[in-house]
């Protein structure tokens, strides 16, 4: 964009009027963004709202801030509410904590860089569409048949909701359905694109996944354990600007000290980790080659199905057969949690995805990789 502005006849025009956020929220954003270097925009944003709103920053000395954030959420006002965290692990912990308190919270789910097109349920739907391919245009009959087969086969899968939402959105934007358009739409999408949080009392998300969304009340849980790079500061700025009316920041660092016109609270309490912790496994947390021996068993599972944990294996609950093996890194991580008094209480299927090694032969078939949730409980 900077280079384009320097082209002959090029001009850089800043849009400075904000009709979305309250005055104090916009003021906080203006104060904070001054700490970000190398920005194209230089003019401060002007709030066109009549609402002052509220900005409150709570500075903690505690390493863990889950409990005070949850307490704060229980006192939330009217309107849509979101909690923004830095990591997926923090987001899942907050989700479990709020659900345990009776709050209908939903997580903006992610596959951590994995393609939505590799999701088991999505793969099956695409195969059903491909089987009826006769021209570049998808016939209405073939489309409805693919929907019926996929929705029926995976009716008990929690992940089917993302496929349903994907199909609905494609139908809304494509009156005539072409194979090429469908493939491009699915290939370029991610799971979070199809997270329907419209009926949630509280939405939980990482700051990274919140871009493009807005909420009346935004709570930010920011642990000061990362280097304050420009990229990180830009993420925090995105988080701040998600708030329409009220912004509440919980932090144990000084990164938000540049915000002036706000309420500040000093909390000297030491808070424990919640009694229940959820760890979401990714590819690096399991031995991928182990799935060569359990493909059919994995494909028979559905998202949210119960698993049993017999270290270092995840087993199919009805049969007890081992279908996944944890990596050494994950075993070491669990050992650290054990020193804090936590043990694996239960496990369940989160996603099943197609995977193939980059070094695999062309004719080698893809594996079905199980990505699970491990629920830890303090003994």
What are these regions (language model features)?
Residues 1-53, 57-59:
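Conserved RecA-like helicase ATPase core segment
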Residues 7-12, 52-54, 79, 214-218, ...:
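Short glycine-/polar-rich loops that comprise or flank the Walker A/P-loop
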Residues 10-13, 37-40, 79-81, 106-109, ...:
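Short, polar/flexible loop-turn hinges at active-site or ligand-entry regions and domain interfaces
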Residues 23, 84-248, 253, 257-270:
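Core RecA-like ATPase module of SF1/SF2 helicases and allied nucleic-acid translocases
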Residues 54-56, 80-82, 201-202:
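Residue-level preference for the first positions of well-ordered beta-strands
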Residues 58-79:
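Conserved interdomain hinge at the start of the Helicase C-terminal
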Residues 79-82, 320-322:
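Short active-site oxyanion
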Residues 257-379:
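Conserved active-site motif detector
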């Amino acid at each position: 964009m900077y280079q384009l502005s320097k082209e002959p006849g090029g001009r850089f025009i800043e849009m400075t009027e904000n009709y979305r956020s309250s005055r104090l929220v916009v003021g906080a954003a203006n104060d904070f963004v001054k700490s970000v270097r190398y920005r194209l925009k230089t003019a401060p944003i002007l709030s066109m709202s009549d609402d002052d709103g509220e900005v409150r920053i709570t500075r903690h000395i505690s390493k863990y801030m889950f409990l005070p954030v949850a307490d704060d959420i229980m006192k939330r006002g009217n309107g849509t509410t979101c909690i923004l965290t830095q990591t997926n692990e923090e987001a899942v912990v907050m989700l479990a904590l709020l659900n345990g308190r009776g709050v209908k919270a939903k997580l903006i789910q992610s596959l951590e860089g994995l393609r939505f097109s590799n999701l088991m349920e999505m793969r099956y739907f695409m195969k059903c569409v491909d089987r009826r391919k006769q021209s570049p245009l998808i016939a209405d009959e073939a489309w409805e048949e693919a929907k019926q087969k996929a929705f029926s086969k995976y009716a008990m899968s929690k992940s089917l909701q993302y496929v349903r939402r994907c199909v609905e959105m494609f139908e809304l934007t494509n009156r005539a359905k072409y194979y090429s358009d469908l493939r491009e739409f699915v290939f370029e999408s991610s799971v979070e694109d199809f997270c329907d949080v419209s009926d949630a009392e509280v939405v939980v998300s990482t700051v990274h996944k919140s871009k493009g969304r807005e909420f009346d009340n935004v709570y930010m849980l920011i642990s000061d354990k990362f280097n304050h790079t420009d990229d990180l500061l830009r993420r925090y700025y995105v988080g701040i600007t998600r708030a329409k009316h009220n912004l509440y920041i919980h932090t144990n660092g000084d990164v938000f000290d540049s915000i002036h016109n706000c309420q500040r609270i000093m909390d000297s309490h030491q808070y424990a980790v919640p009694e229940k912790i959820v760890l979401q496994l990714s590819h690096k947390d399991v031995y991928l080659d182990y799935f060569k021996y359990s493909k059919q068993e994995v494909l028979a599972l559905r998202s949210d199905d119960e698993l049993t944990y017999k270290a270092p294996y995840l087993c199919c609950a009805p049969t007890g057969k081992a279908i996944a093996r944890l990596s050494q890194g994950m075993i070491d991580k669990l050992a650290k949690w054990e020193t804090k008094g936590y043990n694996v209480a239960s496990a369940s299927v989160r996603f099943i995805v197609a995977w193939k090694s980059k070094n695999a032969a062309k004719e080698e078939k893809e594996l079905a990789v199980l990505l699970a949730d491990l629920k830890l409980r303090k003994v």
